[in-house]
Design a protein with these regions (language model features):
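C-terminal structural segments of small proteins and small subunits
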Residues: 79-111
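Glycine/charge-rich, flexible interdomain linkers and switch-proximal surface loops
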Residues: 57-60, 108-114
Length: 126
């Protein structure tokens, strides 16, 4: 009985958290914001998976992230599993990075990047 209770606790504990977000920054999770996103995810023990349309990426790999091309206004699902999953998800909800608001600002040499909130929560499936 003790073994089955332990297995049940381990199984329940291995649940994940996931949320859907809209990317707010332009041009999306490209070079620097993408790199900062990956570094943030790597600073936690939990695994991170990002889903965009029918594509999936490892949130701790910049190359994997680039392959799914997460652009501004894309809807992404972030799935986190591990001991610190809730802490990391909370951090990502509030994450800010140096970026542009839109393409016009990006193309305008007179406009510099500013600190912006990267994501908007679309649905909360914790």
């Amino acid at each position: 009985k003790l073994i089955s209770i332990y297995i049940l606790k381990v199984w329940v504990y291995k649940m994940s958290v996931n949320k859907k977000f809209k990317i707010l920054i332009y041009p999306g999770l490209h070079a620097r914001p993408g790199s900062e996103f990956v570094k943030l995810c790597q600073s936690y023990q939990s695994s991170v998976t990002i889903n965009v349309d029918d594509k999936t990426a490892n949130g701790k790999s910049l190359l994997s992230l680039f392959k799914i091309e997460p652009k501004q206004f894309s809807e992404i699902e972030i799935v986190i599993e591990g001991d610190d999953e809730i802490e990391l998800m909370n951090k990502l909800e509030l994450w800010e990075t140096e970026a542009y608001n839109n393409k016009e600002d990006f193309d305008n040499d007179q406009v510099s990047e500013e600190t912006l909130k990267a994501f908007e929560v679309i649905s909360d499936n914790e």
